[in-house]
Regions:
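Ribonuclease/tRNase effector modules and their secretory precursors
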Residues: 1-104
Length: 104
């Protein structure tokens, strides 16, 4: 699926991660296709996803890929940010994290 990167998402990726346009597009496509989704989570990580959906009303698809949270509205990347430190351990303990890492 073709991913559209909004201006806001592009600015945030440059500011927070130092990525250029090409890197943003490439990573957004990877996150959309193979990132950890709400469906793949449980426990504390699921609660974190639920909170993101409540706070970010535009987003209907949240993905975690690597150490970054991507918020999509359909096929548009709305914004992205680095995973908070207190959530990292739940991602590494999540079974889908290990399955998806082996696939890559």
């Amino acid at each position: 699926m073709k991913i559209i990167v909004t201006n806001h998402a592009e600015e945030r990726a440059k500011e927070r991660l130092g990525w250029n346009k090409h890197a943003i597009k490439r990573m957004a496509e990877r996150a959309y296709e193979t990132g950890i989704s709400h469906y793949d989570t449980d426990g504390k990580l699921m609660k974190y996803f639920d909170k993101l959906f409540l706070v970010e009303h535009q987003a209907n698809n949240v993905r975690i890929y690597g150490q970054v949270v991507y918020l999509f509205s359909n096929n548009r990347l709305v914004t992205l940010f680095i995973i908070p430190k207190n959530i990292e351990k739940y991602i590494k303990n999540n079974n889908m994290f290990h399955v998806k890492q082996k696939e890559d």
